[in-house]
Structures are given as structure tokens and as C-alpha cells.
């Protein structure tokens, strides 16, 4: 159709022209807006924005939809389409330079203007909230506001400091009566007088539960109108959430600025050293210079009086070093004395951790878990608490008052699962003021405060630069570039604008509910909190009291039951099903009794939530807080869960919340409309299933009383400043000693060591915004796997220094150091008999076969990315061990040992060769062991020719076998080798040495499977004795002659491995598998579906059957892709004189090119698909052997460079396995994919993209 004809007809459509259509559309939208506004108004409306018409450009927070609702409620207009004549204000948070030029002269305002106008109850001036000024021609200044004049009375972000100085009494009164929170927008540091810093810090730390480093966000106050206020820890009831919802969006935008608060609580001491008094004096002097009346503005800080500091009476120190701290130095020093400022100090680490809140919490959790475990082990079945409950039962009333105040008749107790979640209210605060009645009911915070909340701005520090960096990082979802410092730093700004102090970044560990109602949150910086609430009372840490109360809490719970899961020092999960059945009490009665006893014992309040599972119990606790209880009954679950935000679900963080929001999902009710298939498509099979179940209140997680320790670590990223390499080295050794102490305390040893270093990012300020903090950093990590697990500080320290030297860092830029130890094993076990991962005895599974579910219990917990080693084995007469740089991890697709007789017990053979044995007690320097038959079968001349270390191991194994033979007669040898082989460790070389032969002098050398002569390392060959060199040359000549006269016998090679003397037996415990060029296997092991087809397939010819041991070893170790295409050299078999081997004789001249990769004989893709579909759909629990065959097939495809078919096979398996109702199939697919990706990474340096 021609365009002209279309236009001609369009002109007759009733709209005349395109402009007419748009005008009609805009008019319709305006009418719709007015009609919606009339319905939205419900008594909370106003006319604040009368005459204001906004247009939202781009992403804002609150969102455009939220702003539209706000304009409806408060008399404004919302334009979907921008009109230069009608739109009065453009709302935006970020605009490109071209758009700024296009909108030059228009009012482009940040959304905080709307939010704060509503909070103020009147229309504020838009000037402090302009996104850019008319003088700005580029976007570099978008983050700043124009400087407000000191006489400007508007309560915008530029003059909060002036309000605090001139109208403190008015503000405090207003905060107490209206719960109003003054939240700043972004502002320039180039402001007058004391305004310098308030605009920066008032936005920070408004996110619930975040521990940050003083980085604000311009939209920190804009989540006020999203209809829900998630509390900082889910502790507030609905009626308690009366504070404007300033913080929900800030919780998404506020950056997790510092890992130091996550790893160790630096703010517990602020690491104030000998300069502490100088800093406080400087703060006092600068405050007095800038505002002589400031001391009168803050009622908590009189300078010369007998005052209450932290609620206790203290005489203010007279003299120049006295401070106005809300926490006296003398009082604080008792709880947290000063910590050395230099990491080179010998007491730095111990003092640091002794004052770290999070370190104490972590240690307490471990101690409480062990406490519960000890109670369970020593339990005699007597619970004093239950006896009290039984007595209470006899006199209890038939009615009970619920937490809502309703009277309800007690129902007969049910015996269904019932979980109770106990959580102390404002734990640190409650403990801190339990003996301080004068502080109860007042806003209180636990922190290591800094006086009035201000500290000097150190030269070189640039908080705005750090803030901008983290803002970009959060918004972009990745690390941002460092902004140009020239745009942020003004060398004269500090002196010209009076910016010589900043707000304190001492973190608030916990705050009371009275403080939370005023906008203060856990994790907020103390300086910011003091601006929100000048009457905020600070309480110092008291770790001894916290531990005492935590112990009392758990002892109280243990008096009722030992089925307790220690969540934290102030939180526990209890399975009360048995208690209710025994005492005949209702959940509400039991919860009330527990709460009352906890309060009597600790003088602290606890909230209790009860549900049928852990998820519901936790959600019920949110509703119960503070100091309440709530029983979420099964019949109420559906209605209750629908109204819960998805952010309340476990595992839903900022990233997942954003993704769910993009799908239009905010509540669990919205999430219930999503099918599991769609959720799994969007979030993956496991996460999708989790969301599908959690949003319906389904949770099958048990109350776990014991938890396996996976790692031990020690990190410090506060106060790290080095000037010399030797200082860093000494610190690493000291930290290694700390690791040793922790390993010894947990009774574990570790094998995998990781060194983590935080290095100042290029371009970042040398002086950080937080005193002693790490600032903007890059994280660098190195990992090494030791031969044996250790807890020795010297070994750990040596490994750390080696890795540290490879990093080649600028010492002065180091900001954090951490050591992690993984692959833990118990200390009380012999390392040689305890592998680095759990072992599963084959006897645990019938007939030597078991499901992959059992295997994953072993393999899933620990993955090993081994230190790079390359090993060439030297055994008998021509294999020599030479170490290189790659450790081998083997995947055993089939048994490595094959009985000679078909009558041999298959189950026994499989059970002994499934790679899941406990390792032998002797290990070589490369974590390899040599297995030998009984001493009578050894050839002493061969033994003497072995390297000393290898010979020593063989002798030790013989000694062990002789010791065992006295108590247990060995089974009849097969192939000249004992079938009762000792258990194997990872990467075991099985050396089967035949009996000495009296005839055929060349038989000994011919029995060793030689590599192709081209594969022999000339240096290794030259190092051999001359006599041995001659024998090898003769063996190669003989093999060449035999190869010329022999014929191919494919059937024999298919059923029997060509090298019965040397097998690589791999432990299946290694999850990461290396690529195998040649693999020896047994088709007679287990008659699984894939193996059945394998046996009946004429194409069944194992590639490993015709490869030499050297080829086999290289295929496992080198991972260098397929070798040259010339046929592999065949093994020269002369076994007639070897007892037990005559039945295995075959004289192939040489192997032809290996057949195409096949899966149980299926080569074509359609045949493979059919076989896979039959396998997955007919079996509910896949066998280990089947999975390993699939892994081998995939690795063969990689060797053949047939990646296209590999991609199709992997994706087809994924579809089939994810459709299976058995979750074990998903685990099986993950196992297969992990191994394939490892081989791909090693071969091609990349992985397969599986969507």
C-alpha cells in the first residue's frame, strides 16, 4: 500500500490530523486523571500542588506511577506527554546532555521536591531541588544543588543545618508529635557555614539493616508512598510504621559501602588511638568557632556541667581536652578501649577482634550451636520447663487473650508440625538499658559515638566522590569508574566554605523503637541520626552483658526442648510440636509462658512468631513485634501470605526484587499468578521452585540443630595502612596465627587457602571518607590447594606470602587483608586417612550401585579447583614421576579394574572400584598412593629400581598389608593382584606388578605399556641408567615387530582393557572432572539402562582400550585437546607367561583411529536423543554409572571438536531433566554440566552458554 493513499484515508478518520488525535488523547488522559483523583481521595488529600502540572522524564524514585498517585491526592496534575505550554515542572533524576540543552529554561526538578513538600504540608520552593541550574551547560554538576542563601527560610536540603541551629526546639517538638523526618536531597559541599555536611549525611543509612559507610542517595526519602514500610528488621507492627516511609527505596539505592561493617564491626571502637582527644578537641573547637551557640542547641551536650552522659551521671572533664560526647570516654573505655592504629602493632589483630561486634556475634552463634549439640548428646529426657507447663495446664483458663486483644476459646491442641521463632526486641539496646529505667521510652542507640556526631574533615578525603562512585555502582549494577576528581575537589572549598568537619560515621548497631519512629535505623551513621533526633541517647557496647543474656535465652529454651536451631545470639528457631502434644497447651499459651520467663530471666522483651514451618514462623514474628506474639494458623496462611511483600521472602534481595518488579510483582499474591515453569525460566530451576513454594507459604526446611562448618576465615579491612613490604608480610604471618587459633578452636584443618587483598582503586582518594576505612577498592584474590590439610600457622603463612608476592601490589594502596580456609577436615582424624571431602563407603549401597542422590551428598559440599600440577608417572621399569604444574582430578566413568573371570562377583568388583573408598594411610608428595599386591608377589629387582620415595611407599603399604593379613585372610588374587585393594584417595595410581617370570627375559619389559616413542621426554630418557635405556630400546623394537605381524581384534579390545598393569583409579568424590582422551572401563559392572545398550552395541569400543598408559595419563593431565590424527601405538602384549593374564591375550597390531563419540552405541544425534529421553523418562533415580557415561560422551565430543552437537545434547538434556518431577534430575544435570564446563574451560578457555 502506498504511503500517500494511507495518509489520504487517515485524514478522513474523524481526527482530521495527527495533532488532532494527540490532542484528543491528551484530553482523554486528563479526564481519566481527574476521575481517578476523585476516587483516590479518602480524607488524606490536600491541595498542596494546586496549579502544578508535572511530567516525569526517565527513571525516578518514587516511580512515575507513585508520583501520579501523589499528584492525585494533593491537587496536582500529571502529564503523560510533555507540553511546553501546560507542564509546569519536569521531574527527573538524570538527563543526558542533549536533553538538558533541549529543556533549557524549563524547571527540571528532582522528585524529592514533591515528597518533602507533602511532608512539610505546603508547597516548597523548587529552587533547592533543581536538577541543574541555568548556568550549567553540562551534566557534570547534576548531583549538586545551587547554594541556598543563609537567609532562605525554606526547609529544603540546603538549610537543614540552619534550622537545627536556630529552631531546634521547634524541630524536636515537631518530630515527637508528627514523626516527621527531615531528609535531605543531594547538595553541594560548597555551602555556607555549618551547612557543609548535613546535606551529605542526612540521606545516608536510611535503608533497613544495611551497614554502610556514609554514602547518601538523593532519592533516599522517596519511598514514602509505596504503600508499605518494611522495617529495618521486620520488627514493627503495622501501627508502629507511622513514620513516613523514607527508607524503602533508599534501602535499594544506599550502597553497601563498606565490607568492614559486614566482616568486623569497626565502628565499635573507631580505632581511636592516641589522637582521639586531639580529634575530639578539634571537633569541639571547630563547632565553637562556627556556631558559638551550638552547645545550647543540643541539650545533651553542655560543656561545663554535671551531666548525664549515656544516661549515667558523669562530671564533664575540665580542661582543653574535654569533649561534648554523648558517651563519656571514661565509660566507653571500659567496654571498648582504644585499639592500636597501626597494623604493625603486635596487638592490633587481637584488639581489633575483641572490639568487633560482628565477630562476637559470629563466635557466639558457633558457641550456642555447640551448646545445643552438647545438650542433645547429654540429654536425659528431663525438661524442667515442661514440668512447669504441665502444672500451668491444670489451672489455666479456658480462654486466652490473643495478641490482638480478642478472647477466643482454646481449641484442642493439634499434633501437626509447629515451629516457634523467638527474637529479642532491639537486643543491644534492651540489654544496654535493662538497668537504666531513666532511658526506657526514650530514643536510644548503641554505638561508639563521636561527641555531637561530627568529626574533622581530614585533608585529602573526598566523601562526595566516594558517594558518587557508589551511587553509580548501585544504579548501574556494576563497578563504576572513578569520577574526575577535578570536578569534585576544590582546594579552597574547605576554607572558603567552612567545610572542616563532617558527620560521624560511627555506626548504630541497634536503636530503640522510639528512635525508629523518628527515622533512625540500624546501620545508620551516628552523625546523621543526631540530626534526625538531637535527643538521641547513645549507649556503649557491653559484650559481656550481651553474651550473658544470650546464654540465658538459650538455657531457658533448652529447659523445654533441645530441638533448637541457633540462628543468632538473640534469635532461635524451636520445634515445639512434641511439647504441645505432651503438655496439651495451645501454641499461644506456650509462647506466652516462654516470653514471660525470658523477660523474668533477662529483663529484656522477646517477640514470638508461630507457624507450621520456618517461613511462616519468621513472618509471624514480624507481625508480633515489638514485645508480642502471633500464631499464624493454617487457615489464615493464604490470606496472610498474599499481602506480604516479596522482599519479606528469604533469598529475595535487591537484584531479585528489581527483576520481580519488572515483571509487575510486588507481593506474594502477585507472585502466585506466576507458574513454576515461568519462574524457573526467569530465575533458574532452584530459585524458581523456591519462589513458587515460598509465595504460597510452603517450606520444608527442618529445624537444624547441627550445621557443618564449611570454612574458617579472618578478614580485616579497617585500619590497614602499610608503608613497607615487611610490614605487610609480618601482618600476613600474624593473621595466619589467628587462622591457626580459629582452626584449633573448631577442631578442623583446611586444605584450600585463599588470600584476599583490597587495593585502593586507581583514581580513588588516598584518604578515605571514614577514618581508617578502606574506601573505593578493587578486590584481588589468590587460591592454593595444599597437598594435605593443615592448621599450622607456618604452613599457612608461607603459602600466603607466596601468593602475596605474586600479586606485586603497591604496599601503600593496601586497604584490607583476609585469609579463608576451605575444604575442612576434622583434626582428630589422621590426614592420610581422612580425605579433604566426605567419603562414602561402597558398602553403604547395595550391590555396589547407588543413586546419584547419595553421590551428591558427598560431592556437593565441596568443589576442588586444584593447584596446577602436571605429573608423569614412573612405575616398574620405565615410568618416572616428575612434578609440574597441574593437579589432576579424575572422573571414573567405569571401574578401573576388571576381573579376568566373568564369574567374578560383579557387585564385589564394583564395590571395590567405585572410587568412593577411604584412602590408604600412605600418601605420596602429590597426594597419590601406590597400591601393590602382597609382598610375596613383588619383584625385588623392580622394587629397587623405583625412586626412593616411591619405593618407601610401596614398602609401607606392604607393611600395612602384612599387619592386616594376620587378622583377616585376603581374597584370592586376580591377575596376580589382590582384589581386596585398600581404599583409595583422589588421583590414585594403581600399580599391579606381576609375579617374577623365570622364562622370557623380555617379558618384564614387554608387560609395561609403553607410550609412543615420540611421546618420550628426551631429558627423562637420558636420565635413566644406561642398562634401562637399552631395555627400553629393545622393547620398542619388539613392539614394532609385533605390530607389523598382528591383526586387529576389536571384540577383544572392546571387552578387556589392554593394560591390566597400570590403571588410573579416580575417586568420584571430585566434582570437577578433567578431560579424558582415553578411559578404561568395564562394561560388566552394572546392568543399567545405558549399560544394557552399551553391551549390545557393536560400536562399543572403548577408546581407552587401545591407548598406552602415557597417552591415558596425558589425556587426564594435560587437557590439551586431541592429539595428532595418526593411529595410536598399540600395547605390545606378551602375557603368556604371566599367571592369570593368559585369558586376556590379544595381539592387535595397533589401534585404528578411535570411533566417533557414542553414547552406549548411539552416534547420530537423533539416536542419542532417543536414548536420553528413554533414560530420563523411565528412571526416577539415575545411577552414578549412567551419569558418568554421559559425562564421558560429552567430553569425547569436546575432544572431537564437535561442539555443535555438544550444545544440542546439553540443551536437550536440560529440557528433559527440568521437566522431571524428581529434583535429583536437576542435580544430575548440574553435575554433568559442571564437568563439561570444566573441560571446555581447560581446552578452549571458555564455557558453554546454557540458557
Curated annotation (Swiss-Prot):
Region: Disordered, residue numbers: 206-236, 282-342, 1035-1096, 1119-1147
Pfam families: BRCT, IMS, IMS_C, IMS_HHH_1, REV1_C, UBM
Extent of Low complexity compositional bias: 321-342
Subunit structure, as described in the record: Monomer. Interacts with the DNA polymerase zeta which is composed of REV3L and MAD2L2; the interaction with MAD2L2 is direct and requires that REV3L is in its closed conformation. Interacts with POLH, POLI and POLK. May bind ITGA3. Interacts with FAAP20/C1orf86.
PANTHER family found in the cross-reference section: DNA REPAIR PROTEIN REV1 (PTHR45990:SF1)
Family as reported in the entry's similarity comment: Belongs to the DNA polymerase type-Y family.
Name of the protein in its database record: DNA repair protein REV1
Organism taxonomic ancestry: Eukaryota, Metazoa, Chordata, Craniata, Vertebrata
Gene label: REV1
Amino acid at each position: 500500500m502506498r504511503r500517500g493513499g494511507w495518509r489520504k484515508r487517515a485524514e478522513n478518520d474523524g481526527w482530521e490530523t495527527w495533532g488532532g488525535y494527540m490532542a484528543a488523547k491528551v484530553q482523554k488522559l486528563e479526564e481519566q486523571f481527574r476521575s481517578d483523583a476523585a476516587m483516590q481521595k479518602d480524607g488524606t488529600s490536600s491541595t498542596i500542588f494546586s496549579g502544578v502540572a508535572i511530567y516525569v522524564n526517565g527513571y525516578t524514585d518514587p516511580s512515575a506511577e507513585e508520583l501520579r498517585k501523589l499528584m492525585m491526592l494533593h491537587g496536582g496534575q500529571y502529564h503523560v506527554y510533555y507540553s511546553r505550554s501546560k507542564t509546569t515542572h519536569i521531574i527527573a533524576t538524570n538527563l543526558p546532555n542533549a536533553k538538558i540543552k533541549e529543556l533549557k529554561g524549563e524547571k527540571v526538578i528532582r522528585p524529592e521536591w514533591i515528597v518533602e513538600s507533602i511532608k512539610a504540608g505546603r508547597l516548597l520552593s523548587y529552587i533547592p531541588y533543581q536538577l541543574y541550574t541555568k548556568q550549567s551547560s553540562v551534566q557534570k554538576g547534576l548531583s549538586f544543588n545551587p547554594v541556598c542563601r543563609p537567609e532562605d527560610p525554606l526547609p529544603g536540603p540546603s538549610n537543614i543545618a540552619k534550622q537545627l541551629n536556630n529552631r531546634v526546639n521547634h524541630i524536636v517538638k515537631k518530630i515527637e508529635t508528627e514523626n516527621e523526618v527531615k531528609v535531605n536531597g543531594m547538595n553541594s559541599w560548597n555551602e555556607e557555614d555549618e551547612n557543609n555536611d548535613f546535606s551529605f549525611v542526612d540521606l545516608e543509612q536510611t535503608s533497613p539493616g544495611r551497614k554502610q559507610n556514609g554514602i547518601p542517595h538523593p532519592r533516599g526519602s522517596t519511598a514514602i508512598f509505596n504503600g508499605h514500610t518494611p522495617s529495618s528488621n521486620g520488627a514493627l507492627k503495622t501501627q508502629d510504621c507511622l513514620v513516613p516511609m523514607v527508607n524503602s527505596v533508599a534501602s535499594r539505592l544506599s550502597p553497601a559501602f563498606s565490607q568492614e561493617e559486614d566482616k568486623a564491626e569497626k565502628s565499635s571502637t573507631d580505632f581511636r588511638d592516641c589522637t582521639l582527644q586531639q580529634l575530639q578537641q578539634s571537633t569541639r573547637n571547630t563547632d565553637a568557632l562556627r556556631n558559638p551557640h551550638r552547645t545550647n542547641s543540643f541539650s545533651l551536650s553542655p560543656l561545663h556541667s554535671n551531666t548525664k552522659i549515656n544516661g549515667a551521671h558523669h562530671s564533664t572533664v575540665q580542661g582543653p581536652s574535654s569533649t561534648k560526647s554523648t558517651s563519656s570516654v571514661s565509660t566507653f573505655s571500659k567496654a571498648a578501649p582504644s585499639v592500636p592504629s597501626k597494623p604493625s602493632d603486635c596487638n592490633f589483630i587481637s584488639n581489633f577482634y575483641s572490639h568487633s561486634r560482628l565477630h562476637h556475634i559470629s563466635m557466639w552463634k558457633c558457641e550456642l550451636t555447640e551448646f545445643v549439640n552438647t545438650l542433645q548428646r547429654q540429654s536425659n529426657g528431663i525438661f524442667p520447663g515442661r514440668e512447669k507447663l504441665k502444672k500451668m495446664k491444670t489451672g489455666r483458663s479456658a480462654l486466652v487473650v490473643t495478641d490482638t486483644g480478642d478472647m477466643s476459646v482454646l481449641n484442642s491442641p493439634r499434633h501437626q508440625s509447629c515451629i516457634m521463632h523467638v527474637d529479642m526486641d532491639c537486643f543491644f539496646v534492651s540489654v544496654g538499658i535493662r538497668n537504666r529505667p531513666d532511658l526506657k521510652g526514650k530514643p536510644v542507640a548503641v554505638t561508639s559515638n563521636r561527641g555531637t556526631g561530627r568529626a574533622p574533615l581530614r585533608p585529602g578525603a573526598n566523601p562526595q566522590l566516594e558517594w558518587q562512585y557508589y551511587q553509580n555502582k548501585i544504579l548501574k549494577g556494576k563497578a563504576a569508574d572513578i569520577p574526575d576528581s577535578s570536578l569534585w575537589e576544590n582546594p579552597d572549598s574547605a576554607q572558603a566554605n567552612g567545610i572542616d568537619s563532617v558527620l560521624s560515621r560511627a555506626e548504630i548497631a541497634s536503636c530503640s523503637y522510639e528512635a525508629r519512629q523518628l527515622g533512625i535505623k540500624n546501620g545508620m551513621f551516628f552523625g546523621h541520626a543526631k540530626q534526625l533526633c538531637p535527643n538521641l541517647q547513645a549507649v556503649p557496647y557491653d559484650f559481656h552483658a550481651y553474651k550473658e543474656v544470650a546464654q540465658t535465652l538459650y538455657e531457658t529454651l533448652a529447659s523445654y526442648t533441645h530441638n533448637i536451631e541457633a540462628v543468632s545470639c538473640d534469635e532461635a528457631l524451636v520445634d515445639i510440636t512434641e511439647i504441645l502434644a505432651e503438655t496439651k497447651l495451645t501454641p499461644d499459651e506456650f509462647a506466652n509462658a516462654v516470653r514471660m520467663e525470658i523477660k523474668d530471666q533477662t529483663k529484656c522483651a522477646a517477640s514470638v512468631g508461630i507457624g507450621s514451618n520456618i517461613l511462616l514462623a519468621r513472618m509471624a514474628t514480624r507481625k508480633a513485634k515489638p514485645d508480642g506474639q502471633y500464631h499464624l494458623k493454617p487457615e489464615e496462611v493464604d490470606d496472610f501470605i498474599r499481602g506480604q511483600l516479596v522482599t519479606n521472602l528469604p533469598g529475595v534481595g535487591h537484584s531479585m526484587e528489581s527483576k520481580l518488579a519488572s515483571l509487575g510483582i510486588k507481593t506474594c499474591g502477585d507472585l502466585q499468578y506466576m507458574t513454576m515453569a515461568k519462574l524457573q525460566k526467569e530465575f533458574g530451576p532452584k530459585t524458581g521452585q523456591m519462589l513458587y513454594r515460598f509465595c504460597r507459604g510452603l517450606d520444608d526446611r527442618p529445624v537444624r540443630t547441627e550445621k557443618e562448618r564449611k570454612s574458617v576465615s579472618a578478614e580485616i579491612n579497617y585500619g590497614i595502612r602499610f608503608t613497607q613490604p615487611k610490614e605487610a608480610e609480618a601482618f600476613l604471618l600474624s593473621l595466619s596465627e589467628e587462622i591457626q587459633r580459629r582452626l584449633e578452636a573448631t577442631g578442623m584443618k583446611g586444605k584450600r587457602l585463599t588470600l584476599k587483598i583490597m587495593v585502593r582503586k586507581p583514581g580513588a582518594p588516598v584518604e578515605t571518607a571514614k577514618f581508617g576505612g578502606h574506601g573505593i577498592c578493587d578486590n584481588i584474590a589468590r587460591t592454593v590447594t595444599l597437598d594435605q590439610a593443615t592448621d599450622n600457622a607456618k604452613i599457612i603463612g608461607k603459602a600466603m606470602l607466596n601468593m602475596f608476592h605474586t600479586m606485586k601490589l603497591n604496599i601503600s594502596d593496601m586497604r584490607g587483608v583476609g585469609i579463608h580456609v576451605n575444604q575442612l577436615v576434622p583434626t582428630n582424624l589422621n590426614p592420610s586417612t581422612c580425605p579433604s571431602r566426605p567419603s562414602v563407603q561402597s558398602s553403604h549401597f547395595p550391590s555396589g550401585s547407588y543413586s546419584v542422590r547419595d553421590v551428591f551428598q558427598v560431592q556437593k559440599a565441596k568443589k576442588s579447583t586444584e593447584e596446577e600440577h602436571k605429573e608423569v608417572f614412573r612405575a616398574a621399569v620405565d615410568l618416572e614421576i616428575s612434578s609440574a604444574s597441574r593437579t589432576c582430578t579424575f572422573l571414573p566413568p567405569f571401574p578401573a579394574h576388571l576381573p579376568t573371570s566373568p564369574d567374578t562377583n560383579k557387585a564385589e568388583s564394583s564395590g571395590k572400584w567405585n572410587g568412593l573408598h577411604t584412602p590408604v594411610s600412605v600418601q605420596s608428595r602429590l597426594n597419590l598412593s601406590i597400591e601393590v599386591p602382597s609382598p610375596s608377589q613383588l619383584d625385588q629387582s623392580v622394587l629397587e629400581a623405583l625412586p626412593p620415595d616411591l619405593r618407601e611407599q610401596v614398602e609401607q603399604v606392604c607393611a600395612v598389608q602384612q599387619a592386616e593379613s594376620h587378622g583377616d585372610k585376603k581374597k584370592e588374587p586376580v591377575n596376580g593382584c589382590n582384589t581386596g585393594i585398600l581404599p583409595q584417595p583422589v588421583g590414585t595410581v594403581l600399580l599391579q606388578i606381576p609375579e617374577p617370570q623365570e622364562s622370557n627375559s623380555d617379558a618384564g619389559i614387554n608387560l609395561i605399556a609403553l607410550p609412543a616413542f615420540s611421546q618420550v621426554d628426551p631429558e627423562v630418557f637420558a636420565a635413566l641408567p644406561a642398562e634401562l635405556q637399552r631395555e627400553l630400546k629393545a622393547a620398542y623394537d619388539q613392539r614394532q615387530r609385533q605390530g607389523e605381524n598382528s591383526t586387529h581384534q576389536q571384540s577383544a579390545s572392546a571387552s578387556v582393557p589392554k593394560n591390566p598393569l597400570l590403571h588410573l583409579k579416580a575417586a568420584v568424590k571430585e566434582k570437577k572432572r578433567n578431560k579424558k582422551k582415553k578411559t578404561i572401563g568395564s562394561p560388566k559392572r552394572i546392568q543399567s539402562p545405558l549399560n544394557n545398550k552399551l553391551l549390545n552395541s557393536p560400536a562399543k569400543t572403548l577408546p581407552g582400550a587401545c591407548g598406552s598408559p602415557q597417552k591415558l595419563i596425558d589425556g587426564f593431565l594435560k587437557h590439551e585437546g586431541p592429539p595428532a590424527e595418526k593411529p595410536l601405538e598399540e600395547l605390545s602384549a606378551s602375557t603368556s607367561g604371566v599367571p592369570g593374564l593368559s585369558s586376556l591375550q590379544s595381539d592387535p597390531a595397533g589401534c585404528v583411529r578411535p570411533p566417533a563419540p557414542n553414547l552406549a552405541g548411539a552416534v547420530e544425534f537423533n539416536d542419542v536423543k532417543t536414548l536420553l529421553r528413554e533414560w530420563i523418562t523411565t528412571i526416577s533415580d539415575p545411577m552414578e554409572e549412567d551419569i558418568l557415561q554421559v559425562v564421558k560422551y560429552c567430553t569425547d565430543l569436546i575432544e572431537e571438536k564437535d561442539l555443535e552437537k555438544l550444545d544440542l545434547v546439553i540443551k536437550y538434556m536440560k529440557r528433559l531433566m527440568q521437566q522431571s518431577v524428581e529434583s535429583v534430575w536437576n542435580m544430575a544435570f548440574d553435575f554433568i554440566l559442571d564437568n563439561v564446563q570444566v573441560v571446555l574451560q581447560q581446552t578452549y578457555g571458555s564455557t558453554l552458554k546454557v540458557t
